[in-house]
């Protein structure tokens, strides 16, 4: 089985690493463009269950995470107004990690095959005879041509964004 993943992003890198572990051939096809990843300071949080899954499937992730037992979400307008709190006794709720470190860890797999195309279209990709094509890149020409105008958009969605402010903790490892 040959699978094509469109986009050089964290979603595809994690998926590719797991598929390769199951002996499935994977190509990551992407368009060359200047990457802003090198300078990103993004931190992401993953749930306890997702961390367990990644730890079982990806070597070295344990060294990248900071477990958290409690996270409080505050209002942006009134910083003393707590909206809600996630906490579990004796168990980590989330694991924080730097996006770029996880991205670089995923990219280290020597079995990954990256195909950089200046301009790609569906016909070029079909010629490669993939069993399955997965597109996780929202701003590529294929998405724009075949899906953007056909998908009904509903912007009545809710997203939580947070800036975490905490006291510095000295690791004695």
Predicted features and spans:
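Glycine-rich FAD pyrophosphate-binding loop
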Residues: 4-8, 17-42
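Short beta-strand/turn micro-motifs composed of small residues
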Residues: 7, 30-32, 75, 135, ...
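A generic structural signal for short, well-ordered alpha-helical segments in conserved domains
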Residues: 16-17, 107
């Amino acid at each position: 089985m040959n699978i094509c993943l469109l986009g050089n992003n964290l979603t595809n890198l994690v998926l590719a690493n797991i598929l390769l572990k199951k002996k499935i051939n994977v190509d990551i096809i992407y368009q060359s463009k200047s990457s802003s990843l090198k300078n990103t300071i993004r931190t992401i949080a993953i749930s306890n269950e997702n961390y367990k899954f990644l730890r079982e499937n990806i070597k070295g992730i344990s060294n990248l995470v900071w477990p958290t037992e409690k996270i409080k979400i505050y209002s942006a307008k009134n910083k003393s107004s707590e909206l809600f709190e996630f906490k579990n006794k004796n168990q980590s709720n989330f694991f924080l990690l730097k996006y770029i470190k996880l991205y670089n860890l995923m990219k280290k797999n020597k079995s990954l095959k990256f195909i950089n195309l200046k301009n790609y279209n569906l016909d070029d990709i079909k010629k490669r005879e993939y069993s399955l094509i997965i597109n996780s890149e929202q701003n590529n020409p294929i998405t724009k041509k075949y899906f953007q105008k056909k998908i009904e958009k509903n912007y009545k969605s809710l997203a939580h964004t947070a800036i975490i402010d905490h006291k510095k903790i000295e690791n004695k490892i």
